Amino acid sequence: MVKLTPELIEQCAQYINPVRDRELDLRGYKIPVIENLGATLDQFDTIDFSDNDVRKVDGFPLLKRLRHILLNNNRVCRIGENLEESLPRLETLILTNNNMQELGDLDTLVSVKTLTCLSLLRNPITSKRHYRLYVIHKLPQVKLLDFRKVKQKEREAASLMFKGKKGQTLAKDLGKRSKTFVPGAALPTEKSSGPSPADINAIKVATISIVIYSDANRNE
């Protein structure tokens, strides 16, 4: 594992991606903890943390410019609270192939009102009962979930499912959280096989499409 230091950040690739966003490439260093990002001087629109060992999405300083975070193929099982305070413009959070377990663990994203794109593909959470409708209900700001546009009929179905006392009871039953996090606990001894290079490229293309889609909506 490699500690995310200011020196590493300075050495990593930095470039303008196809949608003209400034991107920092931190892929493949087996970084366990997000830290020291103040060293970026808030100069990036996108940070790519793919292929590391991050277990919790937190540790961000105030980064007013950052809009897109890619965390494909890590070990993420927790999302920190109050992300909106440190990432006031966060639009995209890609968590494909991680270890998110319980629907209630997504509740910390409720306050991130700027979030429009979320991917939880290849996470245990996606096999939970009513997964997609629960996320649509809890995170109405999300327009693209697992690279599929949230349709109006899905919003209506989610509203109906969680309406009234029965709906509230169902949401409470579904929305339990994982037990208190202990580093290394309840994690597989072998990391599941991650996306292939082709998969990663596809995710990149999809993310670029999301950015274009978001910008188009913003300009309407």
Where does each model-flagged region fall?
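Long, contiguous C-terminal flanking segments immediately downstream of a protein's structured core
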Residues: 1-48, 53, 65-68, 84-92, ...
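Active-site glycine-rich loop that binds ribose-phosphate moieties when present
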Residues: 102
